[in-house]
Regions:
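Structured secondary-structure scaffolds
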Residues: 27-31, 70-71, 75-175
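Cys/His-enriched microdomains
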Residues: 51-53, 124
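Short cysteine-rich clusters marking metal-coordination/redox-active sites
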Residues: 55-57, 68-73
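Short, well-ordered, mixed-charge alpha-helical segments that flank or form enzyme active sites
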Residues: 27-31, 54-64
Length: 175
């Protein structure tokens, strides 16, 4: 795996860190399941059927434009049930937060880029994959036939390392 290569290189370069965490660690899996359950209980996750083009090699759905680019191989049309996060419900809140906190996104041209993106309706975010198609990942706490999609659980890793659910004082000092 890659992780030992990084940690070995950091030692040679005299680079120190407070914590090194991987998304495969039990402490991370615990936090992901906890957050997923909270978000589900809040009504921000729902099950729906999705149909689209799927790149088997990339393990993700792609747009028609991406399919036409020739950059993807082994593309198939796929229709399946998955769980979705209601991202669209938070669009106005995101815009307000960014505008109320001028330094939240740096540099300024990136902030403007994000605000421009948020002018178009946000799509809800698919956060799962059926175990029948993807046998690795963190199991959803509310449906054992599904795992969390890696790009959703990877973001949670930041707050796992910051002590969410394990070190309240550390978490409050960092977050």
């Amino acid at each position: 795996t890659m992780a030992p290569r990084f940690t070995s290189l950091w030692e040679k370069l005299h680079i120190a860190n407070d914590d090194f965490i991987r998304t495969t660690e039990d402490r991370h899996k615990k936090v992901v399941k906890e957050i997923l359950q909270i978000v589900m209980n809040n009504g921000d996750i729902y099950e729906a059927e999705y149909e689209g083009l799927y790149s088997v090699s990339e393990e993700r759905f792609i747009t028609e434009k991406e399919a036409d680019s020739g950059a993807f191989r082994d593309i198939k049309k796929l229709k399946e049930k998955n769980y979705f996060f209601k991202m669209s419900a938070y669009q106005e809140q995101l815009i307000k937060h960014i505008n109320s906190n001028p330094n939240f996104i740096q540099p300024n041209h990136r902030k403007n880029e994000i605000l421009g993106f948020l002018k178009k309706p946000l799509n809800d975010l698919c956060i799962s994959r059926p175990k029948s198609r993807l046998n690795w990942g963190i199991e959803l706490p509310f449906d054992d036939k599904y795992v969390t999609y890696v790009w959703f659980d990877a973001l949670i890793n930041y707050i796992t390392a910051a002590g969410y659910s394990s070190d309240k004082n550390l978490f409050q000092s960092l977050w």
